[in-house]
Amino acid sequence: MRTLLAILLFPLLVQAAGEGMWQASSVGITLNHRGESMSSAPLSTRQPASGLMTLVAWRYQLIGPTPSGLRVRLCSQSRCVELEGQSGTTVAFSGIAAAEPLRFIWEVPGGGRLIPPLKVQRNEVIVNYR
C-alpha cells in the first residue's frame, strides 16, 4: 500500500520541484505459448519532453494467475530492465532521452501451450525527467 501511495504522489512532488513528467498506458497482451515473447504497444509522451529520464514508475495488471517463470522487462530503445513485481520504480533509464518510448516485454520460458494463457489487462508507466 505504501509503495502504491508513493508511486501516485511522487509525480506531484517532482512537478512541484520544476521537473517534468509524463504518463502513458495501453491495453495488455495475451500470450498463449511458452518460449515466445510479446511486446506491448510503445508507451510515449503525447507532449514534447526535453531532458533526460530520472525515475520511471511502472504498473501492470494481469487477468488470472501468474504463470510460473513469468519474465517481464521494461525496455527503451537501448536498455531493458527486468521488473520484479507488478509495480515499482527504477532509475535504470537515467540519462535516456525523456521522449524515448518504453515497452513492456512479456515472456514465459519453456515450450508448449500456456493453460490458462497469460492475459495482461493494462500496462502503465510514469516517466520523470529533468
UniProtKB/Swiss-Prot annotation:
Q: Which residues form the signal peptide?
A: 1-16
GO cellular component annotations of the record:
bacterial-type flagellum
Corresponding gene? flhE
* Any one biological process term the GO annotation gives: bacterial-type flagellum organization
What is the name attached to this protein's record?
Answer: Flagellar protein FlhE
Biological function: Not essential for flagellar formation and function.
- Give the UniProt keywords, A-Z: Bacterial flagellum biogenesis, Signal
The reply on keyword Signal is yes
List the InterPro entries hit by this protein, alphabetically: FlhE
**Pfam families named among the record's database cross-references:** FlhE (PF06366)
Q: Which taxonomic lineage is given here?
A: Bacteria, Pseudomonadati, Pseudomonadota, Gammaproteobacteria, Enterobacterales
